[in-house]
Structure formats: C-alpha cells, structure tokens
C-alpha cells in the first residue's frame, strides 16, 4: 500500500506561526545525496584570489497570510558551486549583512552525501562566524583579492539583501572591476539592491527561479503562504532579462555574470564557474 505524505507545512516550534516545507514537497524536491559530479580540475588555481560569499543571516520570511516560512540559504545551492570552486583552487570567505551566522535550510541538507557533508563540516566555521559585509565593502579596491562574489539561493536571499546598500556596493565593485558574479535560484534577488542607484547590471541576462513557480509552491505546502512580492518582476523593472520561465537546471553566462535557475542547476553552475574562473586566472 502506498503511503501518502502530507502536503501540510510542518510546524517549526522555534518560532510562533512558523513552518517548514511539507513532507510531500520535501519528498519531491530534496534528496539525502546530491548530484555532485564532474569535479575534475587537474590544474587548480594556486594564486591569492578567492570568492566572497554573501550569505543569508535571517531565517523567517513572512508570507501573505501572516505565517512565516522557515528558510535561509539552500544547502545544495550553496555547497555544490563552492565544492567545484574549492576543488579548482579557489578558497572562499563568507559575509552576511549583520555579521551574524549564516542560516541554512537544513531540511534540504544532503545528509548522506559522502563528499558534500565532509566539505560542509570542514568549512562550517566560516558560515558560523562570517565577516560583516560592511567591513568587507569598506576595504574593497581595485587590488582586492576577491575574484568573484557568490550569492547562494534559498528564500533567505529575499530577506534583507535586496535592500542592502552594502550588497549594492559589493556588486558595483565586482562589475566595475571585472570580477565574476555568481548566483542561482532566489540568489539574484540580491541584485535588487542596485535598484535605487548606479545599476551596472542593467541589460544583463540571467537564469533565476521563476515567479510562476513560486506562485505554485504553496499548493504542495512548500511554503505556508504566498510571497508578498516576486523578485523576478522587480528584476525586470530594473532592466534585467530572465531567460528561463521553467526549472530545468539551466545555467547562463552573460559576460562575467554566471547564473542558474534552481538547485537542479547547482552542479552545472559550479562547473561553469570553476571553468570560467580558471580560464580568467590561469597562471
């Protein structure tokens, strides 16, 4: 007999009126083992350049009915690109807006993955003790050692990042100084920080999680309610072109902006980013 899993969001007892995704949605969109593969970089980078990860520092996202979605950065979307980049020779640092610890969607952690989990444990202290983004921004100049800014996905990227002047300054620095910008799924919501000033991403094309898909996820209990705004609509208003309208694991390169559509694109985005950065920073 087939056991039907519930489509009701699961209660997060750590906060009032907060919820994790339903058992059903987790059965459809998470796995205990990732699809990590193709980690083959025989001539890794040996220089000083590294990645700046701008991570989420808030867990609870209000929805239209007042319920809170218990979110953060998606582990697959964070760790698979970093696994590839690290294997290709690029170390990374983590920063959050507040300087407080990164929040992860632990319900999506590939807890049986024999490569990803040791990698996470090895670097957990970076996520637990991040830099404060304002301090990083204050030190940026043309000679800074960051080769790329990486904004992971997860609905946590919708909280704070789109309004942050420090996020805007970091992105402006990256584009103007010919550095890479890497993001996927909901991570490009951070680009909205550029709305109210100098916007060097005007005219760029990206992949991102479709608004249409976000509007469907409450039906299966992934979120306990609908979003109060949709980042894709806002990105288009600021002159960006989202080239996908579905979720296929697609990645895209527009100059040095590298993006993916969902967690299904995390491995491919990691490969693309590693290859592009190795080509740019070859010894």
Curated annotation (Swiss-Prot):
SUPFAM superfamilies: Class I glutamine amidotransferase-like (SSF52317). Belongs to the peptidase C56 family. HchA subfamily. The keyword Hydrolase applies. Keywords: Cytoplasm, DNA damage, DNA repair, Hydrolase, Metal-binding, Stress response, Zinc. It catalyses: N(omega)-(1-hydroxy-2-oxopropyl)-L-arginyl-[protein] + H2O = lactate + L-arginyl-[protein] + H(+); N(6)-(1-hydroxy-2-oxopropyl)-L-lysyl-[protein] + H2O = lactate + L-lysyl-[protein] + H(+); S-(1-hydroxy-2-oxopropyl)-L-cysteinyl-[protein] + H2O = lactate + L-cysteinyl-[protein] + H(+); N(omega)-(1-hydroxy-2-oxoethyl)-L-arginyl-[protein] + H2O = L-arginyl-[protein] + glycolate + H(+). Induction: By heat shock. One of its GO terms (biological process) is methylglyoxal catabolic process to D-lactate via S-lactoyl-glutathione. PANTHER family: PROTEIN/NUCLEIC ACID DEGLYCASE DJ-1-RELATED, PROTEIN_NUCLEIC ACID DEGLYCASE 1. Homodimer. InterPro entries: Class_I_gatase-like, HchA, Prot/Nucl_acid_deglycase. Zn(2+) binds at residues 86, 91, 123. This is Protein/nucleic acid deglycase HchA. One of its GO terms (cellular component) is cytoplasm. Protein and nucleotide deglycase that catalyzes the deglycation of the Maillard adducts formed between amino groups of proteins or nucleotides and reactive carbonyl groups of glyoxals. Thus, functions as a protein deglycase that repairs methylglyoxal- and glyoxal-glycated proteins, and releases repaired proteins and lactate or glycolate, respectively. Deglycates cysteine, arginine and lysine residues in proteins, and thus reactivates these proteins by reversing glycation by glyoxals. The active site is at residue 185. It is found in: Cytoplasm. Its EC number is 3.1.2.-, 3.5.1.-, 3.5.1.124. GO terms for molecular function: glyoxalase III activity; protein deglycase activity; thiolester hydrolase activity; zinc ion binding. It comes from Shigella sonnei (strain Ss046). Gene3D superfamilies: 3.40.50.880. HAMAP family: Deglycase_HchA. The lineage of its organism: Bacteria, Pseudomonadati, Pseudomonadota, Gammaproteobacteria, Enterobacterales. Its main location: cytoplasm.
